[in-house]
Amino acid sequence: MTEYIHRNIDSELIAWKEDSMRKPLLLRGARQVGKSSAVKNFGKQFEYFAEVNFERNKAIKTFFQGDIDVRLIAKKISSYINVPIEAGKTLLFLDEIQECPEAIMALRFFKEDYPELHVIAAGSLLEFTLQELPTFGVGRIHSLFMYPMTFDEFLYANHEEGLILLRNEAYGNQSLDQAFHDKLVEYFRTYLLVGGMPESVLAWTKTHDFNRCRNIQEDIILTYEDDFSKYKKRVNPDLLRTTMRGICHQAGEKLTYKQISADYQSSQIREALRLLTLAGIVTPVVATSGNGIPLDAEADEKSMKVLFLDPGLLLAVLQLEGDLSQQLIELILAGTPQELVNKGGVTEMVAGLEMMRYKPCIQRQKMFYWEQKGKSVAEIDYLEIHNMKITPIEIKSGTQGGMKSLRLFMREKKLTEAFRCSLENFGSFDYIDKQDDDAIRHVTILPLYALSLLRSR
């Protein structure tokens, strides 16, 4: 039996189980991020675990045809798979539910007609199927979004719970011992290559073989592209494949449609990007003025960067495209921390992924950055809401004098708090803005291996 690796969503599933007003749960996310494994592990909390996989159990699809009687459906499933389905004792798991649109439509009726039964559904590319459904139970179904493993989960997989606890005690000017800091930096470098796909992480913990991980990552990418072909009646699979791969070449950069492909119009690439976003494969980081909350009130979707769902998969795409340079690998493995942060678009992307994944998983999260209008190249990598205030976050390593964009933004928006995220140790400093009536502003240095602390401090 495959070893299960602790996931952040485990606690969300337990909370859902104990909620007396729970709704059927729809677990959403890209293929192979660990949805099924998380539910199967969670199933140990129940006396019985009744699993239906619509890719393998095609006959069960017929149970959902015609008039929907969910109690009768549950009885039929119980008889077919020979597992008791009893309210309060059984977890009913409907996996790969995108293969049975009728089952998606039936989820709402479990809330209305069989609310005492614990029901979880999961699937990949669900949004492609949901687009064709008139409704799938808004208000009667609870969604959770799942992603590849965060850096903290990666540390758990490597049995470094003690290292996490030590790190969590450091903050501001309370820096880590250099030995622990160096160890976390090395783990972060490894994470950039191994990524967070559970199969790749598990392979790394067993073999410490980067090539084994890369083979797994390439297989996952090819599986994604095979999935696109299943929806060729709705969208051109080559367009999705071209857009997905083209995005990877612009990691950490402002997205330019023309650089993705000259064979497709911008409107076609924009639609492919929308579908890849819905499928959880990419996440746009949209430019915003940063004048107030909410950040999307003044967002400009014509200016965006794009986060690919996993750093390891990103490098696998570049490998498949013949564009993964040895220089980039050497930068990740052996470049100085300053070079890795300031020159590596992958590092900026991972920082965005980390910040997104530590937010509540009950909705698809939006990400924002700031760029000054006009000819200036001033830019803030990310804008976050921290303690109900707009907080600029720079992914850079350097001295105070190298923070021109950060200083400009804080002065323009009259902000007093900011974060600089790099591979430096924990720290902080104040500076006096001589161009703004000697206003005192505070910058916290947060290591990239500690972005999970951003929301808790």
Briefly describe each language-model feature range:
Residues 1-16:
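N-terminal pre-Walker A segment at the start of P-loop NTPase domains
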Residues 35:
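Conserved lysine of the Walker
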Residues 38, 42:
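Hydrophobic positions on the alpha1 helix immediately C-terminal to the Walker A/P-loop
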Residues 56-88:
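Short glycine-rich substrate-engagement loop in P-loop NTPases that contacts/grips substrate
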Residues 131-249:
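Interdomain motor-coupling "hinge/lid" segment immediately C-terminal to the ATP-binding subdomain
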Residues 201-378, 384:
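Accessory nucleic acid-recognition modules appended to NTPase machines
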Residues 351, 355, 380-399, 418:
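Conserved catalytic cores of phosphodiester-cleaving nucleases, focusing on short active-site segments
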Residues 426-457:
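Domain-level recognition of nuclease-like catalytic cores that cleave nucleotide substrates
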